[in-house]
Swiss-Prot record:
Keywords: Ribonucleoprotein, Ribosomal protein. InterPro entries: Ribosomal_Su5_D2-typ_SF (IPR020568), Ribosomal_uS9 (IPR000754), Ribosomal_uS9_bac/plastid (IPR023035), Ribosomal_uS9_CS (IPR020574), Ribsml_uS5_D2-typ_fold_subgr (IPR014721). This is Small ribosomal subunit protein uS9. Residues 143-152 have a biased composition (Basic and acidic residues). Belongs to the universal ribosomal protein uS9 family. The keyword Ribonucleoprotein applies. It comes from Nocardia farcinica (strain IFM 10152). Pfam families: Ribosomal_S9. Residues 136-167 are annotated as: Disordered.
Length: 167
C-alpha cells in the first residue's frame, strides 16, 4: 500500500492516468429499422388484472386501437391509462406496426388498462420472441396478483374493526 498522493514524494501529476477522447468520434446511434412483421394469423392473448379480463387480437397494421368498438381516446380518456396501455409497444419500438382489437370485461379503468398492457406484451412475444428480455426487464410480462381482500364477518371492512371501548 502506498500513502496518499500528497504524502508520497515519488508521485507526480504526470504519473496519473489520462484519458484521451477523440473529438471526431460520434455517439449518434443509427435509428433502428425493423422489417415489417409478417404473421400468418392474428395473435390472440388474454390478460387479467384485479377483476378485469381482456382478450386481445394483434394484427399487422398502422397502430390503431379498437377497444370494445371504440378508440383508445374514447375508452380511456385518462392519458395515464393510454400511456400505460401503449408502453409495451413503445418499449419494443413497434408503435405503428400492429392494430390491436380488444374485448375488455369487468373491473374498472385501472384494472382494465393493466390487463390490456399484459395481454399486449404477451401477444408481442408470440410475434417476436426476441423482444421477451426487454419486456420482462420492464415488468410487462408479470401478472399482478393483487386483488381486493375479502370482507370478514365481525369487521366493518376487510380489516377495519368496529370501535373498541375499554369501559
Amino acid at each position: 500500500m502506498t500513502a496518499p498522493e500528497e504524502f508520497n514524494e515519488d508521485y507526480t501529476a504526470e504519473d496519473a492516468a489520462v484519458e484521451v477522447v477523440e473529438e471526431d468520434y460520434g455517439y449518434e446511434a443509427e435509428p433502428a429499422t425493423y422489417a415489417p412483421v409478417v404473421i400468418d394469423r392474428p395473435v390472440q392473448t388474454v390478460g387479467r388484472r384485479k377483476e378485469a379480463v381482456v382478450r386481445v387480437r394483434l394484427v399487422p397494421g398502422t397502430g390503431q386501437f379498437v377497444l370494445n368498438g371504440r378508440s383508445i381516446e374514447d375508452y380511456f380518456p385518462n392519458k395515464v391509462h393510454q400511456q400505460l396501455v401503449k408502453s409495451p409497444l413503445v418499449t419494443v419500438e413497434r408503435t405503428e406496426s400492429f392494430d390491436i382489437h380488444a374485448r375488455l370485461v369487468g373491473g374498472g379503468p385501472s384494472g382494465q388498462a393493466g390487463a390490456l398492457r399484459l395481454a399486449i406484451a404477451r401477444a408481442l412475444i408470440e410475434v417476436t420472441p426476441e423482444d421477451r428480455p426487454a419486456l420482462k426487464r420492464a415488468g410487462f410480462l408479470t401478472r399482478d396478483p393483487r386483488a381486493t381482500e375479502r370482507k370478514k364477518y365481525g369487521l366493518k371492512k376487510a380489516r377495519k374493526a368496529p370501535q373498541y371501548s375499554k369501559r
